[in-house]
């Protein structure tokens, strides 16, 4: 069945933007819910029982399929196209839930691995200013801005643990109850600096292709005994949506490739006492990158408002073309806010960061001091149909036809699909 009641809970913010949900129907509550279903221990807010048919099950195994960017809008479009999506809707329950803010993979994988909100763990975006490093870096690949290999920040002597304000993982908490956590990770990042932190306490199974990942997942489900959480993240659909845009034939083909492969491999799984969960971290919006509005090209004087870090690096805006976080020299704050609102107020919500905190866009208070230092001073949230960004040749630009991070319904409404047999 489709449990679409939560759609009415998304409150308007301004224009076509809506507020995220954290209290119940939220991606943020997936880790606590998995922990509760497998251990009986309640660590905090849970997904409501109607996501599971009215009462919480207590399976022996939980399998989480984390399909990057395949949110509510795409489930609505494709639910009748594939055997597994039809089965979730016809035999299980499909519920819209809120993504985090920002609606990004960096925030979401950190929350899923640590069990706390970005308000606490402080890693909220791909491009993010880390005060301990004195510069804006790309968080998950742990590299400086520009063209650098993954984990290049290690060569600069940066401690990757300083990216996160929290380090105990959900896997370590499950282990204290005798529950195994088995995470399926692509070889390109399985041993990365970030992944070693976020998957501490888990068994990591590596793969190179989707088919390899799904066969290994199926074999593990069939072989494992005892309580276990198995989780597979797949980023292929998101990658194509970025490169070509959602709604294109490339995007549709990648979606078909994922689900048809899944249907084929899991057509005869036949394992009982296993609960399957399907979720996403966000959706996607399309804009031609050639139409990107660059703040500092429209108003070159804005470059003078950026502060310098203690290591003499300019603190460039963090975020993406869908969510921009600007650090501004204190003495220029009022002037910067006025200029930004006057020049870009027709295409974006432009507010002091304190507004986002007061509106609890990052979740309930308190906010960790480290997150507050990273956020900067001014938040720019583009309305639907617009990319707004900062242009720094070789470092920051807008080349993607698809993006996310903002607060439109297309970006923010994710999904929780639940079924007990495939």
List the predicted regions and their residue ranges:
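Feature captures the catalytic ectodomains and active-site-proximal regions of enzymes
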Residues: 1-422
């Amino acid at each position: 069945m489709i449990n679409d009641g939560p759609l009415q809970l998304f409150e308007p913010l301004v224009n076509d933007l809506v507020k995220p949900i954290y209290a119940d129907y939220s991606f943020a509550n997936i880790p606590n819910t998995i922990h509760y279903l497998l251990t009986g221990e309640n660590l905090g807010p849970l997904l409501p029982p109607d996501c599971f048919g009215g009462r919480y099950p207590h399976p022996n195994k939980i399998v989480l399929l984390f399909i990057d960017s395949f949110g509510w809008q795409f489930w609505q479009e494709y639910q009748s196209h594939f055997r597994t999506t039809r089965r979730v809707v016809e035999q299980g329950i499909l519920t819209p839930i809120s993504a985090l803010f920002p609606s990004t993979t960096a925030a979401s994988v950190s929350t899923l691995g640590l069990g706390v909100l970005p308000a606490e763990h402080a890693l909220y975006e791909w491009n993010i200013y880390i005060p301990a490093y004195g510069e804006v870096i790309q968080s998950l690949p742990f590299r400086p801005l520009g063209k650098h290999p993954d984990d290049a920040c290690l060569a600069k002597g940066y401690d990757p643990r300083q990216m996160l304000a929290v380090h105990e993982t959900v896997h370590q908490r499950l282990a204290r109850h005798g529950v195994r956590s088995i995470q399926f990770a692509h070889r390109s990042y399985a041993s990365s600096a970030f992944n070693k932190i976020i998957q501490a306490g888990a068994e990591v199974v590596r793969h190179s292709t989707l088919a390899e990942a799904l066969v290994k997942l199926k074999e593990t489900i069939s072989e494992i005994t005892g309580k276990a959480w198995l989780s597979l993240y797949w980023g292929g659909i998101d990658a194509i949506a970025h490169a070509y845009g959602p709604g294109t034939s490339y995007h549709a083909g990648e979606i078909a490739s994922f689900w048809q492969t899944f249907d084929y491999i899991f057509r005869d799984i036949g394992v009982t006492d296993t609960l399957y969960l399907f979720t996403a971290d966000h959706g996607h919006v399309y804009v031609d990158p050639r139409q990107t509005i660059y703040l500092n090209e429209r108003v070159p004087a804005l470059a003078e408002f950026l502060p310098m870090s203690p290591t003499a690096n300019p603190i460039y805006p963090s975020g993406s073309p869908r969510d921009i976080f600007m650090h501004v020299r204190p003495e220029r704050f009022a002037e910067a806010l006025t200029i930004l609102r006057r020049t870009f107020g027709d295409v974006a919500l432009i507010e002091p960061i304190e507004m986002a905190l007061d509106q609890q866009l990052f979740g309930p208070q308190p906010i960790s001091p480290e997150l507050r230092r990273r956020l900067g001073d001014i938040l720019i949230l583009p309305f639907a149909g617009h990319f707004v960004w900062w242009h720094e040749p070789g470092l920051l630009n807008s080349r993607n036809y698809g993006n996310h991070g903002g607060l439109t319904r297309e970006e923010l409404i994710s999904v929780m699909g639940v079924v007990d047999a495939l």
